[in-house]
Design a protein with these regions (language model features):
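A short helix-breaking turn/cap at a secondary-structure junction
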Residues: 224-331, 354-357, 538-566
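Gly/Ser-rich catalytic/binding loops embedded in alpha/beta enzyme cores
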Residues: 20-208, 226, 250-253, 262, ...
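Glycine-rich, small-residue loops and helix-cap segments
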Residues: 42, 99, 140, 199, ...
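Flexible glycine/proline-rich, aromatic-decorated loop/lid segments
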Residues: 167, 211, 217-236, 502-506
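Short helix-loop capping/hinge segments that flank enzyme active sites or metal/cofactor-binding pockets
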Residues: 98-118, 298, 303-317, 368-452, ...
Length: 583
């Protein structure tokens, strides 16, 4: 299946070879500003740039080391690039993303010839009928949507034992810094593709960690926006309370450009969150501010000078006392923290002051309760008969997986979905699995967590942001026992819908380690300033590019590394009786 998906794009690229023989060789790691300068001066065209990325994907993703990050190439990408070049030749440049190729996670709808499947054959068939708002915003800004990236199937929300970066449709994505290592998830392909220079920027989605963890694992900048800053319309959901769409990029500047273009600065009627505030601000009297149109104005190479940051080390020693964080990793984290003070920031120890950053205690109930409802609403946007779960429910998808277990469940099951389907249906119904807690009570717990900890610390300690390590370095991919998380900190901002920016901060045994800056809702300008200051002071990414080689293990838990990467060649044959009817 994946070979066929690439065939059309490869054939199209061959016809353009004569025109692309003089592609510049200095495009690896090139930034948006550099590429625009080259196109403005005539040194480069969008067609040549698009061809460069296609060639790189063919050589390093589908062949060679086999990163396996790109699910599908857009067969119209070169034609779109040519049209944008013609616009430029006539004097029209839509903005900083004009002619710039981008990749989108395979849960973000594009109303073109590409599938939007969330990595599952249950959503393969007729492509989505229209663009997601994010895709539409990118197209309007002149971006070339180059293709779709692989992901942890259903955004890592199907099994308690899932493997990050694996989907039935896409197989296993691998880490450019170590092909034996995991790219984290669920925006696995997005993070790996940005790191491997398969596009200028890529976009993923996050509910809790799915943008920032791949950023950490793959050594790129990852920007998780405030919930409602980017529209979720046309994005396969988990939770309307927590879902958000954001960029992976190789520099903070490119992430800032990407956010400027992708955001919904005005209300999007397809997503009510774009007109309101996230959970953490609800009931506080705080209102949605006017958001900047250009986030690059907040870039500052001295952005840490004079700033006050609250630091927390909660959880960094590991979730499991029997699998502590290795000493070299902790040493690298402390070295990364030291760079903050070296660059002029003052650190306030929030742990000593008694704040709690374990995450909202009601989060999991909120996620499983909303998923069943929200995914059915998404299925309703797919016309009857267009894909196996069109007009269906979570039960429809559950049944599809059982009928096609050979391709959908060769390594792990759907116990998380079974648990979700067992919940009581009402928002005020007590949930026995959660000690009688109701959905509405869980929402309030998460809201209070934000007020009493994140926002309280920011205000009382006069902080510019909160900072900590993002996640443990990438582990060896293990399709038998699943992911080997030691720690992760994204829950600090997940339940309440607050933003995070993750930036590369160090290397451990050849794989990246990052730190994350957290703030209250709509604090992206401050976070971008801080991250750009850290990036300028450390240059971790610039001095440590991916090697596409195997690496040295950093824990004694390795499991099974799959080499070459597991892939699937063809979709299952769907029996007519399994195609959902219009409900």
């Amino acid at each position: 299946m994946r070979k066929l998906l690439f065939a059309a794009a490869i054939l199209a690229s061959v016809s353009a070879r004569a025109q692309t023989a003089s592609i510049p060789t200095n495009l690896n790691e090139a930034t948006v500003v550099q590429l625009q300068s080259m196109m403005a001066s005539g040194q480069l065209t969008s067609v040549r740039l698009t061809q460069y990325y296609i060639d790189r994907i063919i050589g390093l993703d589908q062949n060679g080391p086999g990163v396996n990050a790109v699910m599908e190439l857009n067969p119209d990408a070169l034609a779109i690039a040519k049209s944008l070049d013609m616009e430029r030749a006539k004097g029209t440049v839509r903005g900083p993303m004009h002619g710039i190729p981008v990749l989108l996670k395979d849960n973000i709808d594009t109303g073109d010839k590409m599938q939007t499947s969330a990595g599952s054959f249950a959503l393969v068939g007729t492509p989505a009928p229209r663009d997601s708002t994010v895709a539409a915003n990118l197209r309007a800004a002149g971006a070339v949507i180059l293709g779709k990236t692989n992901l942890s199937e259903w955004a890592n929300f199907r099994s308690f034992e899932s493997v990050s970066g694996w989907s039935g449709r896409g197989g296993q994505t691998n880490n450019p810094y170590g092909i034996d290592r995991n790219p984290c998830g669920s925006s696995s392909g997005s993070g790996a593709a940005a790191s491997a220079n398969f596009a200028t920027v890529s976009f993923g989605s996050e509910t809790d960690g799915s943008i920032v963890c791949p950023g950490n694992a793959n050594g790129v900048v990852a920007l998780k926006p405030t919930v409602g800053l980017t529209s979720r319309a046309g994005v396969v959901p988990i939770s309307h309370t927590q879902d958000t769409v954001g960029p992976h990029a190789r520099t903070v500047a490119d992430a800032a450009v990407a956010l400027s273009v992708a955001q919904s600065a005005k209300f999007d009627g397809r997503d009510p969150a774009t007109g309101g505030v996230p959970l953490g601000w609800q009931g506080t009297g705080k209102t949605r501010p006017k958001v900047p149109s250009d986030y690059t104005q907040f870039l500052d190479p001295h952005g840490l000078q004079g700033k006050v940051l609250g630091i927390t080390r909660q959880g960094l020693n590991g979730f499991d006392p029997f699998v502590p964080t290795p000493v070299p990793v902790m040493d690298a984290i402390e070295a990364a923290f030291q760079k903050l003070t070296d660059a002029g920031a003052t650190l306030v120890d929030l742990d000593a002051l008694g704040y709690n950053f374990a995450g909202g205690p009601g989060e999991f109930l909120v996620l499983v309760f909303e998923f069943r409802i929200d995914v059915a609403k998404y299925f309703a946007t797919r016309p009857a008969g267009s894909v196996p779960v069109a007009q269906g429910t979570l039960q429809t998808a559950f049944d599809f997986n059982n009928a096609h277990a050979d391709v959908e469940m060769p390594f792990f099951n759907q116990d998380l979905w079974a648990f979700t389907l067992s919940l009581a249906p009402g928002p005020d119904d007590p949930q026995p699995a959660f000690g009688g807690l109701t959905y509405n009570q869980a929402l309030e717990l998460d809201r209070q967590f934000a007020i009493q900890n994140v926002d309280a610390a920011l205000t009382a300690q006069h902080l510019d942001a909160i900072v900590t390590a993002t996640d443990n370095p990438a582990w060896s991919t293990d399709l038998v026992f699943g992911d080997h998380f030691i720690f992760g900190t994204s829950s600090i901002a997940a339940g309440e819908g607050y933003p995070i920016i993750q930036v590369p901060a160090g290397m451990v045994f050849g794989v990246p380690l990052g730190i994350s800056f957290f703030g209250t809702a709509f604090s992206e300008p401050t976070l971008i300033t801080l991250a750009s200051g850290y990036e300028a002071a450390t240059q971790v990414r610039a001095n440590n590019l991916p090697t596409f080689a195997a690496t040295v293990p950093f824990t004694n838990i390795q499991g099974t590394t799959v080499t070459p990467p597991h892939r699937r060649a063809a979709p299952p044959t769907v029996k007519p009786s399994r195609v959902p009817k219009h409900l």
